[in-house]
Amino acid sequence: ALYTERGVTAEGIEKTLALDLLAPFLLTNLLIPRLKASRPARIVNVSSGGMYTQRVRVDDLQYKKGRYDGSIAYARAKRGLVILTEIWARDLKDVGVAAHSMHPGWADTPGVSSSLPSFYKITKTILRTPEEGADTIVWLAASREAADSSGLFWLDRQPRTTHVFPGTHESQEERKQLWSKLESLSGWREEKKGTG
């Protein structure tokens, strides 16, 4: 969801962070024991092309600094989700659990038309169908080919780079801080912490 104003959950967590990064962090980590028990298994995280424009801001995950911009908050959260996917891929590579992230492309969905009306008006004739946007998600979840890799970022069933603009790379220390801050916000702790 793209919010036009900064809002917080009942727990005091910025809504975009809660929905698009903290919830997948918590849910995936809670499911990992079950995924390991039912291996081979897969984690498929749906990111966004918007993440290409932003770096993760571990110093301001809750977007308290500066003027709030819902598109930027969304892109930052989706960048964080790609980072988490890479961490899970590394940590789970030897236990039969693959982790993938992907960008569905720009699809003609109610979310795009209501959250980005100007963008939608300009691009509606070239947007993908929802089915086209979902194709790579289903392929990553079910195909034999996708089971043979892990930690990649996909678009149209092809691995893609996670960085196209300078200044969007994070350091190993920022990865560790991201994981630690999400643990703190979620109340979940891992015995052997994944640290990016």
PLM regions and their residue ranges:
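A short, exposed helix-loop element centered on a Lys and neighboring polar residues
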Residues: 28-29, 86
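C-terminal helical subdomain
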Residues: 77, 123-164, 172-180, 188
